[in-house]
């Protein structure tokens, strides 16, 4: 008799079974003994529940759940938005009308025209139509058509790259309108002016007619690297260069008129960007640059041989300008960057609401590249006479000269025949101490100023002159006590000398050819 227990038949009571999932009509369900709430929101797809009679049949292929479609139509404030007011559709019809009759066949899913929008519709339709026409040429149609198709795909890849770079880089969402603004600044600054006289070409600083951008009553906007020479009253005269791209009749002319143009331009750019039609406005602006806005008001010539910068010429300033002229575009950008602090003050005090609105809008949306472009555009018409790289370098050298130790050798002045000499070089008394601020502090005890009191004794004090009245005019020094080392010495007026009367080489501070 066996001692093993009697095997029992498994029933529903003693079988360890997993709890079944229960679904309720309201959408809730019990999964693993846990009640799940019904899913809220729109359901993208519903799988059909199999009937009891179908459970023994093989399961068919399950249909995928459809994905949410990208909304079509106006997608405002999104990269790659279509132009409103049927601009996108209108350009599509324009491309269809401009395309040849042979460009109707489709290229399949890789058709560049499927991914184009706005101006890309016209470009891709023309390139694809040209490829289709090349394919219809007998004998050589196959290779030419293939090459033209590859060219069309290359143009599409270039457009996609530009769209990605201009729409996804942070702070650099460029548009055609921004490129149009850049066209105002990136004029060919590296070109030098040439004057043709009887078949002989002369390099000059005078602006040619092709370098004149805009003319006002007292202002001329021109290409950088030249100065306008205007003929007035049967005589040619150089205008004063206020900025590298702006010249005026004289230094007292305000730049308010030009600044109002920049106000209007930046205000229009801000409005177009806020309405998301910047590409359309930029296209209109680029096309309008092909035409002349205003007639010529001044007669510009090239017989003055003007200087790029006004004022006194020092050796440091001359060397700085010659170095900066090797790269005029760099000189233009550096000159405008150095004027930005003063430009910010002028924006507020001058109530330039268009520029201020543009800066505020572009700063809020994070387009820092546009903020910089607007600042440079406004700084380009900043009215000041110290704007060239030479003036900046001269100011920097003046500040740095305060900390130069200077010469430490003993300075000995020698009076020979009424002239003062130091190492066989003529020098006046005051220039001997022009060796730096620190040198004047530490080396004055080594300076032999014997003879200077005798020379300065002939100079008069301030009470030796009569009280003047009326406007300030030039005076001609005629007295014997008017010496260059006296404080009351009045230098003679500068005269204009024609370059043809100068004996020796004429140095032109224009960009090197």
Swiss-Prot record:
Compositional bias annotation for Low complexity: 32-47
**Region called Important for endoplasmic reticulum and mitochondrial localization, residue ranges:** 112-152
Which residues does the propeptide include? 178-191
Q: Where is this region: HVR1?
A: 385-411
Q: Which domain of life is it from?
A: Viruses
A Gene Ontology molecular-function term?
RNA binding
Annotated site residues (Cleavage) in this chain: 177-178, 191-192, 383-384
**One Pfam family of this chain:** HCV_capsid
- Repressor among the record's keywords? no
Which intervals of the chain are annotated as region Interaction with EIF2AK2/PKR?
2-58
Region annotation (Interaction with DDX3X) maps to 2-59
Recorded hits in Gene3D superfamilies, A to Z, give: Hepatitis C Virus Capsid Protein, Chain A, Hepatitis C virus envelope glycoprotein E1, chain C
Which residues does the entry place in the Cytoplasmic compartment?
A: 2-168
Q: Where is the region Disordered? A: 2-75
**Miscellaneous comment:** Viral particle assembly takes place at the surface of ER-derived membranes in close proximity to lipid droplets. NS2 associates with E1/E2 glycoproteins, NS3 and NS5A, which interacts with the viral RNA and core protein to promote genome encapsidation. The nucleocapsid buds at the ER membrane where E1/E2 glycoproteins are anchored and afterward associate with nascent lipid droplet to acquire APOE and APOC. Secretion of viral particles is probably regulated by viroporin p7.
Identify its protein family: Belongs to the hepacivirus polyprotein family.
What this protein is called in its record is: Genome polyprotein
Species lineage, top-down? Answer: Viruses, Riboviria, Orthornavirae, Kitrinoviricota, Flasuviricetes
């Amino acid at each position: 008799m066996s001692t093993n227990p009697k095997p029992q038949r498994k029933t529903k009571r003693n079988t360890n079974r997993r709890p079944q999932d229960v679904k309720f009509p309201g959408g809730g369900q019990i999964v693993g003994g846990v009640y799940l709430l019904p899913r809220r929101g729109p359901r993208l797809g519903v799988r059909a529940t199999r009937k009891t009679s179908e459970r023994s049949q093989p399961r068919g292929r399950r249909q995928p759940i459809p994905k949410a479609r990208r909304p079509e139509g106006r997608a405002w404030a999104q990269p790659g938005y279509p132009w409103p007011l049927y601009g996108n559709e209108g350009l599509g019809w324009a491309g269809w009308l401009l395309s040849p009759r042979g460009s109707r066949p489709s290229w399949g899913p890789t058709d560049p025209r499927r991914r184009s929008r706005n101006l890309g519709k016209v470009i891709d339709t023309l390139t694809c139509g040209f490829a289709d026409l090349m394919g219809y040429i007998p004998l050589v149609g196959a290779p030419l058509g293939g090459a033209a198709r590859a060219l069309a795909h290359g143009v599409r890849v270039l457009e996609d790259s530009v769209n990605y770079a201009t729409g996804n880089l942070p702070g650099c969402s460029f548009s055609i309108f921004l490129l149009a603004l850049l066209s105002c600044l990136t004029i060919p600054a590296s070109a030098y002016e040439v004057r043709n006289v009887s078949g002989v070409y002369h390099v000059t600083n005078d602006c040619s007619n092709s370098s004149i951008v805009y003319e006002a009553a007292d202002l001329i906007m021109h290409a950088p690297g030249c100065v306008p020479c205007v003929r007035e009253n049967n005589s040619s005269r150089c205008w004063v260069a206020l900025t590298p791209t702006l010249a005026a009749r004289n230094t007292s002319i305000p730049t308010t008129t030009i600044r109002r143009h920049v106000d209007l331009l930046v205000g229009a750019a801000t409005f177009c960007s806020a309405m998301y039609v910047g590409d359309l406005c930029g296209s209109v602006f680029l096309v309008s640059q092909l035409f002349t806005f205003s007639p010529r008001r001044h007669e510009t010539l090239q017989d003055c041989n003007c200087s790029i910068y006004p004022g006194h010429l020092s050796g440091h300033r001359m060397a700085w300008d010659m170095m900066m002229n090797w790269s005029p575009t760099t000189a233009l950008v550096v000159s405008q960057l150095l004027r930005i602090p003063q430009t910010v003050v002028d924006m507020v005090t001058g109530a330039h609401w268009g520029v201020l609105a543009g800066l505020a809008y572009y700063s809020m949306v994070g387009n820092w590249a546009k903020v910089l472009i607007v600042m440079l555009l406004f700084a380009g018409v900043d009215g000041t006479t110290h704007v060239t790289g030479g003036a900046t370098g001269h100011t920097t050298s003046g500040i740095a000269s305060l900390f130069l130790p200077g010469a430490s050798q003993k300075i000995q002045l020698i009076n020979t025949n009424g002239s003062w000499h130091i190492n066989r070089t003529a020098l006046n008394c005051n220039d001997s101490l022009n060796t730096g601020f620190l040198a004047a502090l530490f080396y004055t005890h080594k300076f032999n100023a014997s003879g200077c009191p005798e020379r300065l004794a002939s100079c008069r004090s301030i009470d030796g002159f009569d009280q003047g009245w009326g406007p300030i005019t030039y005076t001609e020094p005629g007295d014997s006590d008017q010496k260059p080392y006296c404080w009351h010495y009045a230098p003679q007026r500068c005269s204009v000398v024609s370059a043809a009367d100068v004996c020796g080489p004429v140095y032109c501070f224009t960009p090197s050819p």
